Amino acid sequence: MRVPARYRSAAAAVELFAAANFAFLALDIFLAHSVNEFARWEEWIPFGFSIAAAPLLLASFLAGGFRPRGARAARALGLAVGAAAVAVGVSGLLLHLDSAFFERQTLANLVYTAPFAAPLAFTGLGLLVLLDRLVEAAEPEWARWALLLALGGFVGNLGLSLADHAQNGFFRKTEWIAVAGAAFAVGFLATALFARSDRRLLRACLGVMAIEAAVGVAGFLLHLRGNLEGPGRTLWDRFLYGAPIFAPLLFANLAILASIGLRGLIAAPAPES
C-alpha cells in the first residue's frame, strides 16, 4: 500500500521525537539521580537504557525509513525498545513510590518523595514507539492514539506541577501558571478526542498547544534564572539542588506530540454521516 507523504512524515517525526527524547532523558536522569549520587544501583538502569535506546531507535529508523511498521528489522527492534521502555517506566514508578509513599500513604510523602510520575516518561515513549509499529500512520487511529498519549502526558505533568511546586508552598504566584496550563491542556485535548471530527476545535487546540509550548519555554527561563541567582557554593550545586531545569520543557515536548496527533486528525477524511 502506498502511504501518502504527509503520513510518512508524521511517522518519521514520531520516530525522531522518541529518539531525541530518550537522549534527553539520559541527561535529565543523570542530573536528578546525582542528587543522591546514584545511591541505589537500580538508579543506573534508566540512565543506561536512555543512552542505548536513542541510537537503537535511530538504527531502526534508518532500517525502516518512513515506514517503521513496514520493515521487519525495524519493526522487531522498535518493538523490543518500546516494550523495554514501558517496563522501565512502570518499574521506576513503583520504585519511586516505594521510597516513602508505600511505607506511609500520606500526601506529604507523595509530595516530598522522589517524583512519582517522572518515570512514566519512559512508558509514554515506549507506547509511542509501539504505536508506530502496530498501527499504520495513514489510519485515523494512529493520530487518535498519539493524541491520547499526549493527553496522558499532560495529566502526569499536572500531577508533577502540583507536587513539585507544593514543596515550597507555591512561593511565587507564577508557579500556578504551570498547574493552570497543564489543566487547560488536559481539558482541550480530552475534548478533541471526543469531538475529533470538529475541525474548528482541532485547530483551536493547535493554538492552545502553541501557548503550552510558550509556557514551557517561559518556565525553563524562570527555573534557569532561579538557579543562577540561588544559593549554592558552585554553579553545579545550584542546578543540582535547585529548581529542575528541564522539567518545564515537558510542556513544549507534549505540545509537539499533541500537535502531530491533531494535524493527523485534521488531515483525516471526514466520517460518513
Mark where each language-model region is.
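N-terminal membrane topogenic signal
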Residues: R2-F17, E141-W145, A267-A268
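Membrane-interface helix-boundary motifs at transmembrane edges
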Residues: P4-R8, G65-R75, L134-A143, F194-A204
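Transmembrane alpha-helix entry/boundary detector in multi-pass membrane proteins
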Residues: A11, L31-A52, L110-A117, H165-A183
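Juxtamembrane "helix-exit" motif on the non-cytosolic side of transmembrane helices
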Residues: L27-V35, L62-G65, L94-Q105, G159-N168, ...
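Membrane-interface helix-loop-helix junctions at boundaries between adjacent transmembrane segments
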Residues: R69-A84, V88, L95-A143, P271
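Transmembrane alpha-helical segments of multi-pass membrane proteins
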Residues: R75-S91, R144-V155, A204-A218
